[in-house]
Amino acid sequence: EDFALGFSLSEGILRDKSELYDIEIVQQLDGIELRMDVATESFVKLKEKRRNLVGRTGCGLCGAESLAQALRLPVLDDSKQEASKNDALRANIHAASRALITASSIESAFANMQVKQVLQKATGATHACAWVNMDGMVEVVREDVGRHNAMDKLVGALAKAPQQQAGFVLTSSRASYEMVQKVAMAGLDILVAISAPTGLAVRLAEAYGVTLVGFLREHQFVIYTHANRIKV
């Protein structure tokens, strides 16, 4: 359910969780089928996207006919960008995510998320995305074989949750442009990645007002964009 809601929000299919009326989870031999009942306006929007939205473990331009189609967010000034962010998460955590975070909280998150990665410990084959509070403690974590899926699960979990504490998103993967885009679509402001960001991810983060941090280690990290949200 977290994935279904989060994917729909981060892909712009739904603007708010209230547009998702029901989810039926059907176990299949080779996976899981999600049957979703959504608002008519959202269904029409989905048909107009002309994109194959088959879920995979890792998908960037899958089904998109062009890079322009894949890059869903326009470059906006601050006032318009604020208004464009997803309503579903803005009510829960957008204001909290705008708080100033410290270097020590980012560094603490590195170890704290590893402790929370249950599937990774069992399989050694999963990524994780987490919501981390101002003290560097992991509040919510979601895992998946694919980093994009893990991010969608986190977005869905946060959309369903009550007001979250101030904090930021942490991912165990590299920061691709898709990860930055999903964070921006969800109305979040800070993405911290354990590995490197791509060049396009940095450019999009700068344009969309997302603070992007990469190469997180126990006592160091690199700030790529909008460093004003981090107190070093």
How should these model regions be labeled?
Residues 132-133, 224-226:
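Short beta-strand-to-turn element immediately C-terminal to the catalytic PLP-Schiff-base lysine
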Residues 147-224, 232:
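Feature captures the catalytic cores and cofactor-binding loops of soluble hydro-lyases/lyases
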Residues 229:
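An anion-binding catalytic pocket shared by soluble metabolic enzymes
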